[in-house]
UniProtKB/Swiss-Prot annotation:
Annotated catalysed reactions: D-fructose 6-phosphate + L-glutamine = D-glucosamine 6-phosphate + L-glutamate
Top-level division of the source organism's lineage: Bacteria
Function: Catalyzes the first step in hexosamine metabolism, converting fructose-6P into glucosamine-6P using glutamine as a nitrogen source.
Protein name: Glutamine--fructose-6-phosphate aminotransferase [isomerizing]
Molecular functions per Gene Ontology: carbohydrate derivative binding; glutamine-fructose-6-phosphate transaminase (isomerizing) activity
EC class: transferase
Cellular component per GO, a single term: cytosol
Length: 604
């Protein structure tokens, strides 16, 4: 949600800002803008729509060595140029970009900014007017004005501020929103995601909450809000530029679906040695052994991945597992067991709802494990332990490979704990071999893309509604499959436990309603789900079946290679990812950038 880029120094700021914003498109946005300055002039350009629309408005004379840019995902005010960032102060002297939500912006407007004229309806404009007031009316220095504003502002924010009268400096501050400093020779940068600046530098510095940074071309000064200077080491971001591009693919989502066999094999090489022995941080294993209950907290696709691993974790670790929606737990944490441990699943490691839960867990002394794709992310820094899923950059808004990688990573964790406990089922579970078979199963499914596209064209091209049904782990996959379809095709789709159809949902079935049935696990499960298929077919539903090999019958639509039941959700979800992809494609939609959605939800 939203993206920030900024640069000061001996570089072409316009090019860097635009390239950086393009790299942040995947986070989701509805408008964009840049502010560029040099010794002789300043330029502020904003646009509603895509980065390409902004680029079309930039003239050849828009040049400078310092600038800030922003992609906006509307939270306060509609998507208009007036509401797009950067925003300016009352006189236009100060320019600000902001990610986050200022909770007390109405109080600030009433208490401090009476008589000010505002162009838009955003909370960010309130903030930059406040800074401008403190300098131009109260005669504070820029730094003192920024600090005073920060002491008043409540909520989440990542700020990058420029003074058009002294354009050799960028002022930065953050609280609860991600922000990084990029380090260069003769230039320095700020960004909300390392991906935005990876072409310019691989050396980054973390900024923690309630810290202020002053950037010039030759120096980075980090302080707390009281002015105490802080020492902060830098780190190298291991991002491959080839992983960020689409290559020959028309969309990132299809590329990322195709990468899943490689991701499975990467996880094997990461979490198992050459002899197949599982290697997981012993401290994580011990912490789980000491817990009497595991609580998986997540949102969206990661929440569904948690469900898909619940049975496996319980069976292999002998520890009860509960699932929680992070956005709900942030407000009301239920009665916990005596020795709880939290597992937070987040592709980005920046999910604001999950962080809200983690802050509470830390305050309560509850050990936590973050399972994420991004090293150095907020959740990974603030949790007790971190386990990386090594899926590589995931650019498409609709998550695919992160979901399957989360399940596979948790399989290694479950087996490691089970082995440490001497659980025979864990000792017998040849995870390296079984996950290799999963990779082969994915490849087999991917070789049937034309078949899936054909089935989708007949089923989903014009419909407004659809349903997924399944039992056991297939129900959990159905929830994820339904989310994927609704995210990128805009088809109203729900995933239901097949056994619940008779308890209400079947009333929604009418002539030609698409119902996609998932069948794996056992003959008993298959028999019961096929009974549900007959029920919906009798009411006119158009049924498509995705069936595990060995449970298939003549007339089934998509057959998936049989894999170990613990890992079946990985194999079974692949056809549903392709179904969502082709449904979106055939409906003429932007697969990678669905409307109203953001890749990383960094505000609560």
């Amino acid at each position: 949600m939203c993206g920030i880029v900024g640069v000061v120094g001996n570089r072409n700021a316009t090019d860097i800002l635009m390239q950086g914003l393009e790299k942040l498109e995947y986070r989701g946005y509805d408008s964009a803008g840049i502010f560029v300055a040099n010794a002789n002039q300043t330029n502020l350009i904003k646009s509603v729509g895509r980065i390409a629309d902004l680029r079309a408005k930039i003239g050849i004379d828009v040049a400078g060595s310092t600038g800030i840019g922003h992609t906006r995902w509307a939270t306060h005010g509609q998507s208009t140029e007036d509401n797009a960032h950067p925003h300016t102060s009352q006189t236009g002297r100060f320019v600000l970009v902001h990610n986050g939500v200022i909770e007390n912006y109405l109080h600030i407007k009433t208490e401090f900014l009476a008589g000010h004229d505002f162009k838009g309806q955003t909370d960010t404009e309130i903030a930059v007017h406040l800074i401008g007031k403190f300098v131009e009316e109260d005669k504070l220095s820029v730094l003192e004005a920024f600090k005073k504003a920060l002491s008043i502002i409540e909520g989440s924010y990542a700020f990058a501020l420029m003074d058009s009268q002294a354009t050799d400096t960028i002022y930065v501050a953050k609280n609860k929103s991600p922000l990084l400093i990029g380090l260069g020779e003769g230039y320095n940068m700020v960004c909300s995601d390392a991906m935005a600046m990876i072409r310019e530098t691989s050396e980054f510095m973390e900024i923690h909450d309630k810290e202020l940074v002053i950037l010039t071309k030759d120096k980075v000064t980090v302080t707390d809000y009281d002015g105490k200077e802080l020492i902060r080491d830098s780190y190298t971001a291991e991002l491959d530029l080839s992983d960020i591009g689409k290559g020959t693919y028309p969309f990132y989502m299809l590329k990322e679906i195709d990468e899943q066999p490689t991701v499975m094999r990467q996880l094997i090489s990461t979490y198992a040695d050459e002899t197949g022995n599982v290697q997981v941080d012993p401290a994580i294993i011990t912490s789980i052994q000491e817990a009497d209950r595991l609580y998986i907290l997540a949102a969206g696709t990661s929440y569904h991945a948690g469900f898909a691993t619940k049975n496996m974790l319980e069976q292999l670790t002998d520890t009860p597992v509960e699932l929680g929606v992070a956005s709900e737990w942030g407000y009301h944490m239920p009665l916990l067991s005596k020795k709880p441990m939290f597992i937070l699943l987040s592709q980005s490691g920046e999910t604001a709802d999950s962080r809200q839960v983690l802050v509470k867990a830390n305050a309560m002394g509850i050990p936590s494990l973050t399972v994420t794709n991004v090293p150095g992310s907020t959740l990974s820094r603030e949790s007790t332990y971190t386990m990386l899923i090594h899926a590589g950059p995931e650019i498409a808004v609709a998550s695919t490979k992160a979901y399957t990688a989360q399940i596979a990573a948790l399989a290694f964790l479950a087996k490691a704990v089970g082995e440490a406990n001497g659980k025979q089922e864990a000792l017998d579970f040849n995870l390296v071999h079984e996950l290799s078979l999963v990779a082969q199963s994915i490849e087999a499914t991917l070789s049937e893309k034309d078949l899936v596209a054909e089935k989708v064209q007949a089923l989903l091209t014009t419909t407004r509604n659809a349903f997924y049904i399944g039992r056991g782990n297939d129900y959990y996959v159905a929830m994820e499959a339904a989310l994927k379809l609704k995210e990128i095709s805009y088809i109203q789709c729900e995933g239901f436990a097949a056994g619940e159809l008779k308890h209400g949902t079947i009333s929604l079935i009418e002539e030609d309603t698409p119902v996609i049935a998932l069948i794996s696990s056992s003959q008993l499960v298959a028999s019961h789900t096929r009974g549900n298929i007959q029920e919906v077919a009798a009411r006119g539903a158009h049924v498509l079946t995705v069936v595990e090999e060995g449970l298939d019958r003549e007339g089934d639509d998509i057959i998936v290679n049989k894999v170990h039941p613990f890992l079946a959700p990985i194999a079974m979800v692949i056809p549903t990812q392709l179904i969502a992809y082709y449904a979106s494609l055939q409906r003429g939609l932007d697969v990678d950038k669905p409307r109203n959605l953001a890749k990383a939800v960094t505000v609560e």
